[in-house]
């Protein structure tokens, strides 16, 4: 009897390794979340006190969790743009076309969390700086 229970336990553990935890974060294709990164520019820049706006360079990592809605967690590499914060462009108007990346500008890594409940017309975005990124650092 113990042998059967042991075999059942081994199979349960091996099966659990190959499946995802219900309600847990699941890795997704980061390149598909570039638009979400650009939509988070106002929140990222509310945490930034530099002279110029920060803009996404690339999404380094993306994860999605389905609970009461969808929670998307991104790691976004951002860089200093050519647009001054005190200029005519507001953070909500920043795009790749009107605020290009500044050559040699400051770079940082941010964690962006986006919680959405479409049936309630609810969307909440939070951003927090993880760390600065050195100019020669590969990410």
Swiss-Prot record:
In its keyword annotation, does this UniProt entry include Hydrolase?
Answer: no
Task: Tell me the function of this protein.
Answer: Cysteine protease inhibitor which inhibits members of the peptidase C1 family. Does not inhibit asparaginyl endopeptidase. May play a protective role against exogenous cysteine proteases derived from soil bacteria or fungi, or rotting fruits and vegetation.
Enumerate the UniProt keywords alphabetically.
Disulfide bond, Glycoprotein, Protease inhibitor, Signal, Thiol protease inhibitor
The residues annotated as site (Reactive site) are 23
Q: Which PANTHER family match?
A: CYSTATIN (PTHR46186), CYSTATIN CPI-1 (PTHR46186:SF14)
Q: What is the disulfide pattern of this chain?
A: 83-99
Database matches in Pfam families: Cystatin (PF00031)
- Identify one Gene Ontology CC term for this UniProt entry: extracellular space
Q: Tell me, what is one Gene Ontology molecular-function annotation carried by this entry? A: cysteine-type endopeptidase inhibitor activity
Q: Secondary area of contact: where is this motif?
A: 65-69
Task: Please state what the protein is called.
Answer: Cystatin cpi-1
State the Gene3D superfamilies in the record.
3.10.450.10
The record lists glycosylation at 29
* Taxon lineage: Eukaryota, Metazoa, Ecdysozoa, Nematoda, Chromadorea
Which species expresses this protein natively?
Caenorhabditis elegans
Q: Which InterPro entries match?
A: Cystatin_dom, Cystatin_sf
The UniProt similarity line reads:
Belongs to the cystatin family.
Question: According to the lineage, what is the superkingdom?
Answer: Eukaryota
Query: Where does the record locate the signal sequence feature?
Result: 1-19
């Amino acid at each position: 009897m113990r042998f059967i229970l042991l075999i059942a336990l081994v199979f349960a553990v091996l099966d659990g390794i190959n499946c995802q935890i219900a309600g847990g974060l699941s890795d997704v294709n980061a390149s598909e979340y570039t638009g979400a990164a650009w939509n988070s520019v106002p929140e990222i820049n509310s945490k930034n006190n530099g002279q110029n706006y920060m803009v996404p360079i690339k999404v380094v990592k993306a994860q999605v969790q389905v609970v009461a809605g969808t929670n998307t967690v991104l790691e976004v590499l951002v860089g200093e743009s050519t647009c001054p914060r005190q200029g005519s462009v507001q953070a909500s108007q920043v795009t790749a076309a009107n605020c290009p990346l500044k050559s040699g500008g400051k770079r940082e890594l941010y964690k962006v969390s986006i919680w959405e409940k479409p049936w309630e017309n609810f969307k909440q975005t939070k951003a927090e700086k993880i760390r600065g990124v050195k100019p020669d650092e590969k990410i």
